[in-house]
Amino acid sequence: MFRRNLITSAILLMAPLAFSAQSLAESLTVEQRLELLEKALRETQSELKKYKDEEKKKYTPATVNRSVSTNDQGYAANPFPTSSAAKPDAVLVKNEEKNASETGSIYSSMTLKDFSKFVKDEIGFSYNGYYRSGWGTASHGSPKSWAIGSLGRFGNEYSGWFDLQLKQRVYNENGKRVDAVVMIDGNVGQQYSTGWFGDNAGGENFMQFSDMYVTTKGFLPFAPEADFWVGKHGAPKIEIQMLDWKTQRTDAVTGVGLENWKVGPGKIDIALVREDVDDYDRSLQNKQQINTHTIDLRYKDIPLWDKATLMVSGRYVTANESASEKDNQDNNGYYDWKDTWMFGTSLTQKFDKGGFNEFSFLVANNSIARNFGRYAGASPFTTFNGRYYCDHTGGTAVRLTSQGEAYIGDHFIVANAIVYSFGNDIYSYETGAHSDFESIRAVVRPAYIWDQYNQTGVELGYFTQQNKDANSNKFNESGYKTTLFHTFKVNTSMLTSRLEIRFYATYIKALENELDGFTFEDNKDDQFAVGAQAEIWW
C-alpha cells in the first residue's frame, strides 16, 4: 500500500516531465511508465541524501581525541554547544553555471553576510541616512546654543538635523552602470511638538532636496572607473565634525562632474556647478538674480609616506551678468559682484592603532574669505543664505586647521579640532567693509573607554576673535565651554562611528560679546544645561 501511494505521489510530481515527453509516453505501457517514474524517484532521493550527508558532516563536531575544557569559573565547558538559537554560518545557493555538475556539486556555500550583500546588490537599492535628536533643559529656561562652530557641539546643540539618501541602480551591464540618487535634508524642531513643515515657528522646521542626480560608470573611455554625474549635486564636502562646519563645500543647484578619476598616483574630482544669488541694493529692499558658476578641482589621495595622503584643491566662482544687472550695480546702488576663489591643501595621516589626523591650509579672497571670519559657522560659502550684500575689495584670508582622534593606550581616546584664521581688508557682517580679523578656536575631547559600548569624558572648548573695522576700532568675542558626558556607542571611535547616545552636563560662558551682543535667557552671560542626545547614521 505504501509503495502504491509513493508511486502515485511521484506521478503527480513528475507530471510536467510526462507532459513534455508526451509523444514518447504514448508508446509506453502503464507498467513501463511506472518503472521510469520509480527510477527517477530513486535518483532524486539519492541526490537529496547525498547533500544531507554532506551538510551533516559540515556541522557534526569531531569526537576523536577530544579533551574537556573548563571555563573561567572552573566548570567544564559544553563540548557540543547548542546551535539552534544561533544564526547559521552559511547558506547553500544553487550554481547556475552549465558545468557546475561536472565540478562535483550544483550547490556552493555562502555566508549570511555575503548572501545579504548579494541580495542588496541584486536589487540595486540602498537607503542611507543621518539624524540627531534629543532632550535638554537649562538653568535659565529654554537652553540656547552659542558659537557651536568655535566651542564644539557636545551639550551645545539643540537641533534635529537629518539627511536621507535614496539610491537606485537602473542599469549594470557590459561594464556600464547607472544610478539615480536623491538626497533629502532639513531640520525638525526640538522645541514645539507641532513640527509641521511650513508652520515654521522659530524657523526650525524645513526640508529640501539637496541632491537629485544621475551618476554613471564606464561611459567615459578615458576614465572608465570614475563616477560621472549630472544633476543637482556638488563636489564632496569635508567637515570639521566637532565644530559642525566644512572646510570644503561647494553648494550647487545643478551641475556636471567627475569623481575618483585615477590620474597618476592620485585621483581627480572636478565639478562645474551653478548657484544663482540674490544681489541686493544698499537699502536691502530690492534685489536682482545673478547667474553664477563655480569650477571646483581637487587632486586627492596622493600617497606621501606610510598611511599619509595629500590633497590639493582649487575653486573659482564667477558671474554671468546681463547688461541690466551691471547697470543696476553701476547706477542704482546694487552691490557689485566680485569673483572669488579659494586654494589650499590638506594632509591626512592615519595611525597604526587606529585614528587619524587631518591638517589643512586654505587661502581665499572676497566673499569666501569673509566666511573664514565667522566664529559661529565658517563654511566657505559665497553668500549668506543665497543673499549677496557686501562691498568686496580683493581682501584675503588664511585658515589653518587640525582635526582628528588618537588612541592612548587601551582605554583612552582624544579627539581634537583646532583652527587659526586671519584676514585683511575683508567684508564682515559685524564690522563692515575693510575689516581685519584674527581668531583661534580649540576643542579637545578626551574620554575613558570602558568597553566597546561605553565611554566617559569631557569636551573642553575655547575661542577668541578680534575684528578691527575701517576706523581701527576693535571688537572682541570670546568664550568657553565645559561638557561632561557619558556615551553609549557601538564602536570606540569618536569621529567615525555611530550610533552614539550622549548624556551630558554643560557649562558655557560668554566672556566677551562685542560682535553679536549675544545673551542667554534673562540676559545672562552663562548657562548650565543637562540633556540627552542621540546621533545615528546608517
Curated annotation (Swiss-Prot):
It is a multi-pass membrane protein. Residues 1-25 form the signal peptide. The keyword Glycoprotein does not apply. Disulfide bonds: none annotated. It is found in: Cell outer membrane. GO terms for molecular function: carbohydrate transmembrane transporter activity; porin activity. GO terms for biological process: monoatomic ion transport; polysaccharide transport. Residues 52-82 are annotated as: Disordered. SUPFAM superfamilies: Porins (SSF56935). Belongs to the porin LamB (TC 1.B.3) family. This is Putative outer membrane porin BglH. It comes from Shigella flexneri serotype 5b (strain 8401). The gene is bglH.
